[in-house]
Protein backbone atom coordinates (compact mmCIF):
# COMPACT_ATOMS: atom_id res chain seq x y z
CA UNK A 1 0.00 0.00 0.00
CA UNK A 2 1.36 3.42 -0.89
CA UNK A 3 2.70 5.44 2.00
CA UNK A 4 0.58 8.48 1.17
CA UNK A 5 -2.51 6.28 0.71
CA UNK A 6 -1.99 4.77 4.14
CA UNK A 7 -1.76 8.25 5.64
CA UNK A 8 -4.98 9.28 3.93
CA UNK A 9 -7.00 6.22 4.92
CA UNK A 10 -5.92 5.84 8.53
CA UNK A 11 -5.73 8.22 11.48
CA UNK A 12 -3.66 7.78 14.59
CA UNK A 13 -4.61 8.13 18.24
CA UNK A 14 -1.79 8.02 20.79
CA UNK A 15 -2.90 4.98 22.79
CA UNK A 16 0.52 3.42 22.30
CA UNK A 17 2.10 6.11 24.47
CA UNK A 18 0.16 4.74 27.44
CA UNK A 19 1.78 1.34 26.93
CA UNK A 20 5.35 0.28 27.59
CA UNK A 21 7.13 0.22 24.22
CA UNK A 22 10.39 -1.18 25.57
CA UNK A 23 9.16 -4.75 25.13
CA UNK A 24 9.23 -4.17 21.38
CA UNK A 25 12.44 -2.08 21.43
CA UNK A 26 10.62 0.97 20.08
CA UNK A 27 10.29 4.56 21.26
CA UNK A 28 6.99 6.44 20.89
CA UNK A 29 6.44 10.18 20.78
CA UNK A 30 10.00 11.38 20.28
CA UNK A 31 10.17 14.87 18.74
CA UNK A 32 11.23 15.08 15.11
CA UNK A 33 14.52 16.98 14.93
CA UNK A 34 16.44 18.34 11.95
CA UNK A 35 18.84 15.43 12.41
CA UNK A 36 15.94 12.97 12.11
CA UNK A 37 14.68 14.77 9.01
CA UNK A 38 18.13 14.58 7.45
CA UNK A 39 18.22 10.86 8.21
CA UNK A 40 14.76 10.38 6.67
CA UNK A 41 15.79 12.17 3.45
CA UNK A 42 16.74 9.01 1.61
CA UNK A 43 15.47 6.10 -0.45
CA UNK A 44 13.17 3.75 1.50
CA UNK A 45 11.73 0.31 0.88
CA UNK A 46 8.32 -0.80 2.12
CA UNK A 47 9.04 -4.04 3.97
CA UNK A 48 5.66 -5.10 5.30
CA UNK A 49 2.65 -4.23 7.41
CA UNK A 50 -0.10 -5.58 9.60
CA UNK A 51 -3.54 -4.02 9.15
CA UNK A 52 -6.80 -5.17 10.68
CA UNK A 53 -9.16 -3.66 8.15
CA UNK A 54 -9.77 -6.10 5.28
CA UNK A 55 -9.65 -3.59 2.42
CA UNK A 56 -6.27 -2.30 3.60
CA UNK A 57 -4.89 -5.83 3.70
CA UNK A 58 -6.24 -6.44 0.21
CA UNK A 59 -4.60 -3.23 -1.02
CA UNK A 60 -1.24 -4.41 0.31
CA UNK A 61 -1.68 -7.79 -1.37
CA UNK A 62 -2.40 -6.09 -4.71
CA UNK A 63 0.87 -4.15 -4.50
CA UNK A 64 3.89 -6.41 -4.88
CA UNK A 65 6.57 -3.86 -3.92
CA UNK A 66 7.09 -0.17 -3.20
CA UNK A 67 10.12 2.03 -2.78
CA UNK A 68 10.13 5.78 -2.39
CA UNK A 69 12.27 8.86 -1.85
CA UNK A 70 11.69 11.34 0.96
CA UNK A 71 13.00 14.89 0.57
CA UNK A 72 12.45 17.20 3.53
CA UNK A 73 11.87 20.95 3.34
CA UNK A 74 12.88 22.57 6.62
CA UNK A 75 11.50 25.97 5.65
CA UNK A 76 7.83 24.96 5.48
CA UNK A 77 8.07 21.65 7.38
CA UNK A 78 6.93 19.41 4.54
CA UNK A 79 8.28 16.22 3.01
CA UNK A 80 8.18 15.46 -0.70
CA UNK A 81 7.31 11.82 -1.36
CA UNK A 82 8.17 10.21 -4.72
CA UNK A 83 7.22 6.55 -4.90
CA UNK A 84 7.40 3.63 -7.31
CA UNK A 85 5.02 0.69 -6.87
CA UNK A 86 4.97 -2.68 -8.58
CA UNK A 87 1.34 -3.62 -9.24
CA UNK A 88 1.02 -6.77 -11.31
CA UNK A 89 3.55 -6.39 -14.13
CA UNK A 90 3.28 -2.61 -14.08
CA UNK A 91 5.45 0.01 -12.40
CA UNK A 92 3.32 2.89 -11.11
CA UNK A 93 4.80 6.26 -10.10
CA UNK A 94 3.28 8.85 -7.78
CA UNK A 95 4.33 11.96 -5.91
CA UNK A 96 2.79 13.99 -3.11
CA UNK A 97 3.71 16.02 -0.01
CA UNK A 98 3.46 15.09 3.66
CA UNK A 99 3.43 17.35 6.69
CA UNK A 100 5.09 16.59 9.99
CA UNK A 101 4.66 17.78 13.56
CA UNK A 102 8.00 18.13 15.30
CA UNK A 103 6.77 18.14 18.90
CA UNK A 104 4.78 14.89 18.94
CA UNK A 105 6.64 13.00 16.21
CA UNK A 106 3.87 12.54 13.66
CA UNK A 107 3.49 12.60 9.90
CA UNK A 108 0.32 14.09 8.46
CA UNK A 109 -1.58 14.15 5.19
CA UNK A 110 -4.19 16.78 4.33
CA UNK A 111 -6.76 15.44 1.87
CA UNK A 112 -10.34 16.41 1.14
CA UNK A 113 -10.48 18.85 4.03
CA UNK A 114 -9.37 16.21 6.54
CA UNK A 115 -5.93 15.91 8.12
CA UNK A 116 -4.87 12.44 9.26
CA UNK A 117 -1.83 11.45 11.28
CA UNK A 118 0.64 8.60 11.69
CA UNK A 119 3.09 8.26 14.53
CA UNK A 120 6.73 7.95 13.46
CA UNK A 121 8.76 5.27 15.26
CA UNK A 122 12.45 5.50 14.38
CA UNK A 123 14.57 2.33 14.40
CA UNK A 124 17.87 4.03 13.60
CA UNK A 125 19.98 1.05 14.66
CA UNK A 126 18.29 -1.03 11.97
CA UNK A 127 18.13 1.69 9.31
CA UNK A 128 14.34 1.55 9.46
CA UNK A 129 11.19 3.23 10.75
CA UNK A 130 7.62 2.25 11.50
CA UNK A 131 4.32 4.11 11.24
CA UNK A 132 1.53 3.37 13.72
CA UNK A 133 -2.16 3.88 12.92
CA UNK A 134 -5.50 3.76 14.73
CA UNK A 135 -4.07 1.86 17.68
CA UNK A 136 -7.14 2.50 19.85
CA UNK A 137 -9.45 0.79 17.37
CA UNK A 138 -9.23 -3.00 17.48
CA UNK A 139 -10.81 -3.31 14.02
CA UNK A 140 -8.66 -0.68 12.26
CA UNK A 141 -5.27 -0.63 13.95
CA UNK A 142 -2.15 -1.06 11.88
CA UNK A 143 1.63 -0.94 11.87
CA UNK A 144 3.89 -0.61 8.82
CA UNK A 145 7.65 -1.02 8.36
CA UNK A 146 10.11 0.74 6.02
CA UNK A 147 13.87 0.21 5.65
CA UNK A 148 16.83 1.62 3.74
CA UNK A 149 17.62 -1.79 2.24
CA UNK A 150 15.26 -4.34 0.68
CA UNK A 151 17.02 -7.29 2.32
CA UNK A 152 15.55 -7.50 5.81
CA UNK A 153 17.73 -8.79 8.62
CA UNK A 154 16.39 -11.43 10.98
CA UNK A 155 16.80 -8.99 13.88
CA UNK A 156 14.66 -6.31 12.20
CA UNK A 157 12.01 -8.89 11.33
CA UNK A 158 11.86 -9.96 14.98
CA UNK A 159 11.63 -6.33 16.16
CA UNK A 160 8.66 -5.74 13.87
CA UNK A 161 6.96 -8.98 14.89
CA UNK A 162 7.29 -8.05 18.57
CA UNK A 163 5.95 -4.55 17.88
CA UNK A 164 2.93 -5.98 16.07
CA UNK A 165 2.15 -8.26 19.02
CA UNK A 166 2.72 -5.40 21.45
CA UNK A 167 -0.04 -3.29 19.85
CA UNK A 168 -2.50 -6.17 20.19
CA UNK A 169 -2.17 -7.88 16.83
CA UNK A 170 -0.93 -11.31 15.78
CA UNK A 171 2.16 -12.22 13.76
CA UNK A 172 -0.09 -14.04 11.30
CA UNK A 173 -1.57 -10.65 10.31
CA UNK A 174 1.78 -9.44 8.95
CA UNK A 175 2.23 -9.30 5.18
CA UNK A 176 5.90 -9.07 4.20
CA UNK A 177 7.07 -7.83 0.80
CA UNK A 178 8.76 -10.23 -1.62
CA UNK A 179 11.34 -8.03 -3.34
CA UNK A 180 11.95 -10.66 -6.01
CA UNK A 181 8.71 -9.40 -7.57
CA UNK A 182 9.99 -5.83 -7.99
CA UNK A 183 9.60 -4.37 -11.50
CA UNK A 184 10.48 -0.75 -10.73
CA UNK A 185 14.09 -1.15 -9.62
CA UNK A 186 15.30 -2.26 -13.04
CA UNK A 187 13.36 0.52 -14.75
CA UNK A 188 14.92 3.09 -12.43
CA UNK A 189 18.38 1.67 -13.12
CA UNK A 190 17.83 1.88 -16.89
CA UNK A 191 16.60 5.47 -16.60
CA UNK A 192 19.68 6.45 -14.59
CA UNK A 193 21.97 4.81 -17.14
CA UNK A 194 20.13 6.53 -19.98
CA UNK A 195 20.50 9.85 -18.19
CA UNK A 196 24.26 9.34 -17.87
CA UNK A 197 24.54 8.48 -21.57
CA UNK A 198 22.52 11.56 -22.50
CA UNK A 199 24.90 13.76 -20.51
CA UNK A 200 27.91 12.17 -22.22
CA UNK A 201 26.64 12.68 -25.80
CA UNK A 202 26.85 16.53 -25.84
CA UNK A 203 30.35 16.34 -24.38
CA UNK A 204 31.43 13.85 -27.07
CA UNK A 205 29.96 16.11 -29.75
CA UNK A 206 32.06 19.02 -28.53
CA UNK A 207 35.25 16.98 -28.45
Curated annotation (Swiss-Prot):
Q: Where in the cell is it found?
A: Secreted
Q: Please indicate which superkingdom the organism of origin belongs to.
A: Eukaryota
Q: In which tissues is it expressed?
A: Expressed by the liver and secreted in plasma.
Glycosylation positions in this chain? 25, 34, 76, 94, 104
- Give the main localization category: secreted
GO cellular-component terms in the record? extracellular space
InterPro entries given in the database record:
A1A_glycop (IPR001500), Calycin (IPR012674), Lipocln_cytosolic_FA-bd_dom (IPR000566)
List keywords of the entry alphabetically: Acute phase, Disulfide bond, Glycoprotein, Secreted, Signal, Transport
Keyword Disulfide bond attributed? yes
What does its UniProt record remark on the domains? Contains a beta-barrel that binds various ligands in its interior.
Which additional comment does the entry carry? Answer: Eight genes coding for different forms of alpha-1-AGP are present in mus carolis.
Q: Which family does it belong to?
A: Belongs to the calycin superfamily. Lipocalin family.
Name it. Answer: Alpha-1-acid glycoprotein 8
Organism of origin: Mus caroli
Amino acid sequence: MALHTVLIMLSLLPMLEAQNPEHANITIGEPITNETLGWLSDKWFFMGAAFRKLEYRQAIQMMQTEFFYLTTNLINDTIELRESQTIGDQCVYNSTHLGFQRENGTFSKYEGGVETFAHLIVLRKHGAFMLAFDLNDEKKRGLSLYAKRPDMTLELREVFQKAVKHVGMDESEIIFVDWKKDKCGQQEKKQLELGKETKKDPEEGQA
